[in-house]
Each structure stands twice: as structure tokens, then as C-alpha cells.
Amino acid sequence: MKLVLMGLPGAGKGTQAEQIVEKYNIPHISTGDMFRAAMKNNTELGKKAKSFMDNGDLVPDEVTNGIVRERLAEDDAKNGFLLDGFPRTVEQAEELENILNDLGTELDAVINIEVDKDVLMKRLTGRWICRTCGKTYHEIYNPPKVPGKCDLDGGELYQRDDDKKETVEKRLNVNMKQTKPLLDFYSEKGKLHNINGEQDIKDVFVDVEKILASF
């Protein structure tokens, strides 16, 4: 079973990825993990990726694609995998097709976890952290007993810059713009399966299982 998992930040992709790889016994292959492994193993592509990352530059497609090619050729990916964080562009999606074609296989499905932007905003901007002990709260899902104060030590709660509304909205807008052409690409190929990510976590996974039952 060869899968790509998609979803905007806050959609619950990580939770579903854990459940998919556990149930179907396939490796969870994320871009970050691939880069780290290639650099740790000191491969030629790993060295190239490191040089770009050390300079704060984006790793170019030719290096990323090469690392993906090496990873998907490994034994544990022969019977299936869950790709997470790749592809990010139509060009990368086309290269993924070439890689899988060279390996004598193809993608089975692309699962996209859909969540309305307003819901994502609530999920992502609700996090508050205690300045004293670092305990994390969420104003909707795990609120403190007294607003603005930590349950454990009464410390002041603050919000990280990454969790502030303006930052989150900008991040979501960038992601939505990047993702749309990719969703259209896979939709045209009949590979795309959209799932309602606003349901309970268990119900989201039930929908995932229904899709994967046909493979």
C-alpha cells in the first residue's frame, strides 16, 4: 500500500499517520526524517542537503528528489509506505511518479484531511504556555481552571509568536496556495481521497480505513 498523506497544519495529520503505519505495518516516511537519515549516513545527497540547510537555504528539488528515490528503494518500502511532507509541488509529484515507475510500482492513494480554515485557526491559536513550568494549555480543548494562570503553580500563561493569529493565518494561507495545484493534480488522476478532519479522531480513522479497504 503506497500512500501520500496531505493536510494543512492543525488538520491532525500526525495522529492519523501514526494509526495508519501501525495498522498497515508500513514505514512512515517524512521529509525531515529522510534528510536526517541521509545526513547521518553521510551520503552524497545528504552532504548536499546539509550544505544548503546550514546556509539557511531551501534544499533544491534535484537533491530532495534524489533522497526520496534512495529512501523508496530501501527494502522496508517495497511493500508500501506512507509519504508525509512530499510531494509539495506538482513538479515533485511528477518526479515521484517517475521514481515509482522506475521501481516498477505506482501510488495507490492520496489521502487529504480537510478542515475548514476557521477551525484550524481555533486549533492552532488556542495554545498557551506557563512561563514558569512550561505546561501547555489550549483555551478550547484543555483550558486552565483560572484564565491566564497555570493550574500547577499559578504562573502567567503566554502565547508563542508562532501561535499568534497573524502568524498562523499567514502560514495557513501560504500552505493553502501551495497545496491547491497538488490536490488538483491528484484529483485529475483519480488518486485523491478527501476526508473530513473535523470529526472525532476515531471517526477520521474509520474513514481512512474505508478508503484503504479497497487496496
UniProtKB/Swiss-Prot annotation:
Residues the record lists as binding AMP: 31, 36, 57-59, 85-88, 92, 160, 171
MF term (GO), any: ATP binding
Subcellular locations according to the entry: Cytoplasm
Annotated region described as LID, given as residue ranges: 126-163
EC class name: transferase
Keywords attached to this entry: ATP-binding, Cytoplasm, Kinase, Metal-binding, Nucleotide biosynthesis, Nucleotide-binding, Transferase, Zinc
Gene Ontology CC terms: cytoplasm
Taxonomy, superkingdom: Bacteria
Location of region: NMP: 30-59
EC number: 2.7.4.3
Binding site for Zn(2+): 130, 133, 150, 153
UniProt pathway: Purine metabolism; AMP biosynthesis via salvage pathway; AMP from ADP: step 1/1
Binding positions (ATP): 10-15, 127, 136-137, 199
GO biological process, one term: AMP salvage
Comment block on domains: Consists of three domains, a large central CORE domain and two small peripheral domains, NMPbind and LID, which undergo movements during catalysis. The LID domain closes over the site of phosphoryl transfer upon ATP binding. Assembling and dissambling the active center during each catalytic cycle provides an effective means to prevent ATP hydrolysis. Some bacteria have evolved a zinc-coordinating structure that stabilizes the LID domain.
Similarity-based family: Belongs to the adenylate kinase family.
Function noted in UniProt: Catalyzes the reversible transfer of the terminal phosphate group between ATP and AMP. Plays an important role in cellular energy homeostasis and in adenine nucleotide metabolism.
Protein name according to UniProt: Adenylate kinase
Origin species: Listeria monocytogenes serotype 4b (strain CLIP80459)
Gene (UniProt): adk
